[in-house]
């Protein structure tokens, strides 16, 4: 078996030995978190599989030791591969497939997608099963040393470009920076768009995919995105750019630029339009692209006069990214047009569709006079093999570009200060929120078709909150395997629209809506933490008692109840600590209640009864979820005691729904239950971890169990101190 050794020249090479010498194993390497990569020519390697598959280009290989500190959300990357499930061909290596934004690896900035992991601390993971690699990473502790291999990036050509600002400014857009990586694992500032007619376009040397190293004398390597924005804004008419030109071979391993960039033109270009991305909800930033994304074909190489104008028949096979194009139009019979082709997607790979095509039909469904929604539904429901009749109509499409530009201006004008030409910098970039309402983008009258639908309780990572109406955000998944990125309505937009709705609803009444604005809920800021106990369970709403009883009887090893306290005398058959904790005096229990040692307490027949924090903690630390029959007020008291509960509200859809779920109660009882639930939701929505609904108790109970499973931890989201 080939093994990894280290010789005195600080080069790694493979030798024909069964095991590496002990003195050269990774455990005995110097613990230098920032040690430079070690370079070795591929002619010293005897493992062609690595030479062909790892990140970079053929030629030289580099090895790097990267030390990461495990964060609240883990190490912040995903892996694939292993002897039982090779990621590329027959190569058993463990590959990095994703760098999670905001995670430990992304913040460190050195680990890259397609890096091959050789060792985790002292554990050799070069030829192990996938589960063994996962276990090695899980058991590595809080400080993890990774030994990775990649191809050495090709040498970049460095040039200096002199630009003179014109009416359209510098005329290009950028993305990237520390904490806002354009390419996972790379903090560089990249050019993502050249604006036609701008200074960069007229000069002709700056291209999409170029890396900006410096502006005048200001370096842009390893800087925040906002710093790059400021450096480009604070320039005079003559600007000198230091630019690195990447090679095509390296670009093939890169990732497509995100849809939202910062534009340096007096006419903002923020890729916000009334269009539908007809693929998955993944952003283009997370989709592998072909080199042509960074090397756009010049228009004069394929003149518009060479493109046929008659209707064409195109067959596209839906891929994992959907069909891979956006559409606009559908108002007043104006037609449906393609506005964007996703690089590397099915439409792009077919080579048959282009921006400016009008879609006449989909699988025989006539779309010539269809609305935008009708066209989107037709394309979504078209199946795996989609037959499209399209006709190239650039003149008609140009009308949409003008309309889109006007919409952008209207949106941006609401969030830009006078005299500025770029998105206003906002200090609240990169924070996490929990949604306190359901949002269905199809019911929003706004024009952002790339909006992101979500449900109550979903955690969202806000990537960019610089616009006052729409925030760019990523839905956070517990498995960190997939990302849904899009636009969500800002807190201001949500609350303004809800306030307008309430005002319209109460218009003409004597009391009006005075004082209701404070009750409008949108989002709450959250932070992630690790817990080492089983979270208490509080179920609220109709049928909560039945759900509690079923959990205790069906899963006695996972759920338990705590022993309450009381001041009443112990009866002969009762045992202290089993039936109740009998408190010796009323004064003592009252003092403990005032000291917030109880999450809930009350009086019955002149005796005090209550549930103490310590009783709940004892059950939780035994690894059982403590089922609590308490009011919603107990949620905040448990949070204050650092025992963060899972609070589930069973929301009845209607009075009839209450009767259907519980057929044993009368209509009057159902009405009271429905009214109590309505009031409970109005007063305590922000305390709920999740809201469940159902047409039967069985459906509700199934959803309750799933919520508990999803929110059990060990990593959970809790309210943060910061306010939006």
Swiss-Prot record:
The PDZ domain 3 mediates interaction with ADR1B. The L27 domain near the N-terminus of isoform 2 is required for HGS/HRS-dependent targeting to postsynaptic density. GO terms for cellular component: AMPA glutamate receptor complex; cell junction; cell periphery; cerebellar mossy fiber; cortical cytoskeleton; cytoplasm; dendrite; dendrite cytoplasm. Keywords: Cell membrane, Cell projection, Cytoplasm, Lipoprotein, Membrane, Palmitate, Phosphoprotein, Repeat, SH3 domain, Synapse, Ubl conjugation. Residues 65-151, 160-246, 313-393 form the PDZ domain. The modification Phosphoserine is found at residues 73, 142, 295, 415, 418, 422, 425, 449, 480, 606, 654. Postsynaptic scaffolding protein that plays a critical role in synaptogenesis and synaptic plasticity by providing a platform for the postsynaptic clustering of crucial synaptic proteins. Interacts with the cytoplasmic tail of NMDA receptor subunits and shaker-type potassium channels. Required for synaptic plasticity associated with NMDA receptor signaling. Overexpression or depletion of DLG4 changes the ratio of excitatory to inhibitory synapses in hippocampal neurons. May reduce the amplitude of ASIC3 acid-evoked currents by retaining the channel intracellularly. Coiled coil: none annotated. Residues 15-35 are annotated as: Disordered. This is Disks large homolog 4. It comes from Mus musculus (Mouse). The gene is Dlg4. It is found in: Cell membrane; Postsynaptic density; Synapse; Cytoplasm. SUPFAM superfamilies: P-loop containing nucleoside triphosphate hydrolases, PDZ domain-like, SH3-domain. It is a lipid-anchor. Residues 534-709 form the Guanylate kinase-like domain.
